[in-house]
Design a protein with these regions (language model features):
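Short, low-complexity disordered leader/linker segments with a strong preference
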Residues: 1-27
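N-terminal (or domain-start) structured segment
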Residues: 20-91
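Extracytoplasmic
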Residues: 25, 56, 66, 76, ...
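Bilobed "Venus flytrap"/periplasmic-binding protein-like clamshell domains
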Residues: 25-53, 57, 116-182, 297, ...
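Pocket-lining segment of extracytoplasmic ligand-binding domains
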Residues: 86-88, 95-98, 126, 163-259
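A structural signal for short loop-to-beta-strand junctions that line the ligand-binding cleft
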Residues: 100-113, 118, 236-245
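Ligand-binding clefts/hinges and TM-proximal coupling segments of bilobed small-molecule sensing domains
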Residues: 137-154, 226-299
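An extracytoplasmic/periplasmic, membrane-proximal ligand-sensing/linker region
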Residues: 171, 175, 182, 192-206, ...
Length: 317
């Protein structure tokens, strides 16, 4: 997998960026995530939709570590589009955390995908009920360079905490779940969608699953200190898990100012006109609508020019 990934990136670094008019079809390279999450399913289904219905864009997806790596690949002009949570993209634009001293400029939003959430997964029989109960415990906070890690660091910072509040581990979600099943981890942080195939496997195993959110005071503090996050009630897609009070934001697909206007416009058109087909292929596309994209107007990260143009054409400002 990594060899294939490297080859794709090498070719993308050297290929010229040509307009649709010059090239006939724009070759869009789309950074997804690991194969375990909703984002990968969304991106691969959307690429198929583009290839089936666009006369001007040809799309292909690559696996990545997710939001943080995609932002870096966009900044390096190694991909044309990539998924990212708004908290990670905002952190990069502000030049904070991993981007301290070298903020990423020129990011824009092509479309809203779905809501994202922060939650904590522990074994079903765990005595932990709150974040505080995990102080000093063995907790996975995500792979460094990945979106889960960046999101969690920002949330901990908003609470006045650091990684060393726990005994931190830096594993992928799938590896963290395996470690938890072996008794080597006490908790796994998730920052992303309300479902994850690795967490579903955890729930189905003898270890079982309990999901922890945040207390009202923690939610208030987080949202006061990080405006990219809002209080939310997460209806988890894990059977038998009750709604979880937590914080969340938006998963979007991003580009930079280098993506031609006509390409981002075409992507929005395909997403809108063939939305029913998209939802048939992946239910995670249900909320990927022009109205939800328009709701992101006015944030730190602007909508792409092609997106704004398309929204005006269909009467959504």
């Amino acid at each position: 997998m990594m060899l294939i990934f490297s080859v794709i990136l090498l070719s993308s670094c050297t290929r010229p960026k040509q307009s649709v008019e010059e090239k006939g079809k724009y070759d869009l390279l789309f950074g997804a995530s690991s194969t375990a999450g909703m984002a990968y399913q969304w991106v691969t289904a959307f690429c198929e939709l583009i290839n089936d219905h666009s006369d001007t864009v040809q799309a292909s997806a690559i696996t990545t570590l997710g939001s943080s790596e995609n932002i870096n690949l966009l900044a390096a002009n190694e991909i044309d589009a990539g998924i990212s949570t708004n908290i990670v993209a905002s952190t990069a634009m502000l030049g904070e955390a991993d981007w301290a001293g070298h903020p990423v400029s020129g990011l824009n939003i092509v479309s809203y995908m779905y809501a994202d959430y922060c939650y904590i997964c522990v074994p079903k029989n765990s005595p932990a009920e709150t974040l505080e109960d995990l102080c000093g415990k063995r907790v996975n906070i995500g792979e460094k360079g990945g979106g889960v890690y960046t999101g969690m660091v920002e949330i901990l910072k908003a609470l006045g905490l650091g990684e060393t509040y726990f005994k931190p581990y830096y594993l992928s979600v799938s590896d963290a779940v395996s470690s938890m099943q072996d008794g080597a981890l006490d908790a796994v942080f998730i920052y992303g969608s309300a479902t994850n195939s690795s967490i579903m496997e955890l729930q189905a195993s003898k270890t079982g699953l309990k999901v922890i959110g945040f207390t009202p005071d923690e939610i208030s503090t987080i949202c006061e200190n990080n405006t990219a996050l809002k209080p939310v009630e997460m209806n988890a897609s894990y059977e038998g898990i009750p709604p979880v009070s937590t914080v969340g934001g938006a998963m979007c697909f991003m580009a930079t100012e280098k993506l031609p206007v006509e390409v981002s416009h075409e992507l929005c058109r395909i997403l809108d006109e063939y939305h029913d087909e998209f939802v048939t292929n992946t239910r995670w596309a249900e909320t990927s609508t022009p109205a939800n994209t328009a709701g992101l107007t006015g944030g730190l990260i602007p909508l792409s020019e092609g997106t704004a143009q398309y929204l005006r054409e269909i009467g959504i400002d």
